[in-house]
Amino acid sequence: MTALRACLFWAASLASAAALAQPGSQPATEPVTQPASAPTTTRAASTPTTTTPTTTTTTTQAAKEKDRFLAVINGRVHTVTGPVLDRATVLSKNGIIAAIGPEVVLPPECEVVDAAGLEVYPGLIAALAGGIHGATNPQDTSNVYGLNMLVALAGGITTALAGNDVAKLTFGTVEDMVVKPAAYVSLSYSTYKPLERAQLRADLERVRTYLRELQKYEREKATKKDAKPPDKDWIKDKFENYRKLLTHEAIAATGAQSTHELREIADLASTYDFTVVVRGAYEGWTVAPILGRAGVRAVISPREKHEPDEQANRPTGSTIENAHLLRDAGVTLAIVPQTATITLWGLAGRDLLQLNLEAAFAVRGGLSGADALRAITIDAARVLGVDDRVGSLEVGKDADIVVCDGDLLHYMTLVRYTIVNGRVAYDKAKESLYAHIRPTGQREVPQFDDQWPRRLEWPGEITTEARRHGGDER
């Protein structure tokens, strides 16, 4: 009997355990997390999602299936490729711009950023950058909670070159980070390495011959039964990259500074009909028409300083008018600072902390404000080959938006919000970086009552000494 009772008790215990293990036998206890809302943003009337013990779709899955809306309202919208719109709305749906205009109707559930009295621009693009993302495969190697990424967002940067990939500054997530893998085909065409130059030309000529034979075969295969395609087994590695260049599937990139190097690059691009981006080009102003006719694109720093060669009988050296002269010749420009990283030292505008200030210095050299803005937005996107997705505020493009408290090229302007893929990635009021600077948003531009060189109020003993030596005590 004792053994029988023990067996019955053991069987009853197994039955109870099996009943508890059945799905739907008890309500889910996992808490539902709601996205945090910024104090300076509001969310239009949203209906909370509820769960019941019998449902098979979790709250997280339902949230992923639901459309995600964000609207920037009441701002002065600079579309860059179109007109400036006063008191307009930019509405995004699932990270893509869905509508722009003064009379956009918002959906019931929509996160709203009120930009009344503020300026709205497309996200800035750093065509040359380091230290924001990982050098290779940014989704796996980037610190999405790092200070460098946050500081870059505070400067309005939403897209940057990461190694050879183009990536978004998706703070806190790696979702939809990579815009374009393998942005460039790197070329070495230095005047100091004649053997490499000769080899590159020979390789390009071989690929061009192959493409011509392939075109001939495509024309003749319908009428000639004995037509044979050219051998393509060798089209791999560097030759596959060159094939993409000559078929305009890829963009080349190289460093070139002097007049002679720039002439050689322009000749190479014209001869083999491919698009090339030159980095540096501080003497580009001396051959600007040649670069423009060859379709060369350039990544430059307007304040790059190089003294002219006194022994040369032609124009040499750098000039602050470089950007202006290149742009007038039809060269597509991307402006970057001299130090294309995030640093916490140096003068304003010398690194990616103030990409906009480097563009402002190009205005000092004669570039128009509109073209300077293009050089850090849509034209920078064209240099990277991603202008179909970023660089301007247009319906169908990624919702990368910067909201700031003044003209983007003004040295006192601060970014209020940076939006990446339709999500607020930076909010000035919520981060400690600049929250203490003009927290109420009021800005008074200082008025200087002196002229350069400034006349200072020197102590009496200094002015007396200056007078003794014939100086001016003013």
Where do the model's predicted regions map?
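Histidine/acidic residue-rich metal-binding segments in metalloenzymes
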Residues: 206, 212-277, 282-298, 317-330, ...
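Histidine-rich, glycine-flanked metal-binding segment
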Residues: 68, 77, 81-121
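C-terminal cap of metal-dependent C-N hydrolases
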Residues: 75, 394-438
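Bacterial N-terminal signal peptides that target proteins for export
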Residues: 1-11
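Intrinsically disordered, low-complexity serine/threonine-rich repeat tracts
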Residues: 25, 29, 33, 37, ...
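Divalent-metal coordination cores built from histidine and acidic residues
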Residues: 114-230, 330, 461-466
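N-terminal signal peptide c-region/cleavage motif recognized by signal peptidases
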Residues: 14-16
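His/Asp/Glu-enriched, well-ordered alpha-helical/loop segment
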Residues: 135, 251, 292, 301-304, ...
